[in-house]
Regions:
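Sigma70-family region 2
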Residues: 20-21, 44-49, 58-75, 94-96, ...
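Internal acidic/polar
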Residues: 4-12, 97-126
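A short pre-motif secondary-structure segment
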Residues: 138-142
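Short, charged helix-capping/linker segments at alpha-helix termini
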Residues: 2-5, 20-29, 39-58, 160, ...
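Structural recognition of an alpha-helix C-terminal capping motif at a helix-to-coil junction
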Residues: 40, 54-61, 74-86
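Amphipathic, Lys/Arg- and hydrophobic-enriched alpha-helical face
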Residues: 31-49, 66, 128, 173, ...
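Arg/Lys-rich amphipathic alpha helix in sigma70-family domain 2
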Residues: 65-72, 82-102, 117, 169, ...
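DNA-recognition helix of helix-turn-helix
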Residues: 85, 89, 127, 135, ...
């Protein structure tokens, strides 16, 4: 089903075309527009700010090297999100040491005063690391990227029903992990 282009899609196409026409300011505009969402997806996928910054730089390097191959019939945000997920998966595959489940889910030492909201966010972040990378990508894009099932399917190049299935599996796994954290 062909989607009606949005104003955002038109703006993206315009920026890409300006860049391809030699307007280097368009590169800055594209980075300004997508740096935060790309970093957020990478951070949620990788679980650490330094890796997310490195991945974000790699993504933008790839974007500008590959813009001549971008097909404007497709949404730019899907293209750049796909690159972000791929780069994040590459980083995850390249990590030499695997942290044990117990280490990933370690609760801060007793006596450490932590705001409940920050502690809950930290528990969710740690729980995300337990998910398989494909499941983590679906959760990150849905809940931190606010993408619809159809948009996630477009980014990950899978059917929407696969997105729904992965999301169900991931939520169940997260629920189990989070309940085990609270049930000392």
């Amino acid at each position: 089903m062909e989607e009606t282009p949005t104003a955002s899609d038109a703006a993206d196409r315009s920026l890409v075309q300006r860049y391809l026409d030699g307007d280097r300011r368009a590169a800055t505009d594209l980075v300004d527009r997508y740096q935060r969402p790309v970093f957020t997806v990478a951070l949620r996928m990788l679980g650490n700010a330094q890796d997310a910054e490195d991945a974000t730089q790699e993504v933008f390097g790839t974007v500008f090297r590959s813009l001549t191959t971008y097909d404007p019939r497709f949404r730019f945000f899907s293209w750049i999100y796909r690159m972000t997920v791929n780069q994040s998966l590459n980083v995850l595959k390249g990590r030499k040491t695997m942290v044990t489940l117990e280490e990933q889910l370690a609760i801060p030492a007793a006596g450490v005063a932590v705001d409940d909201a920050l502690e809950a966010e930290e528990q969710v972040r740690k729980a995300l690391t337990v998910l398989k990378p494909d499941d983590r990508a679906v959760v990150v894009l849905r809940y931190f990227g606010s993408l619809s099932y159809e948009e996630i399917a477009e980014v990950l190049e899978v059917p929407a029903r696969t997105v729904k299935s992965r999301l169900f599996t991931a939520r169940e796994r997260l629920r189990t992990v989070l309940l085990s954290q609270g049930g000392d």
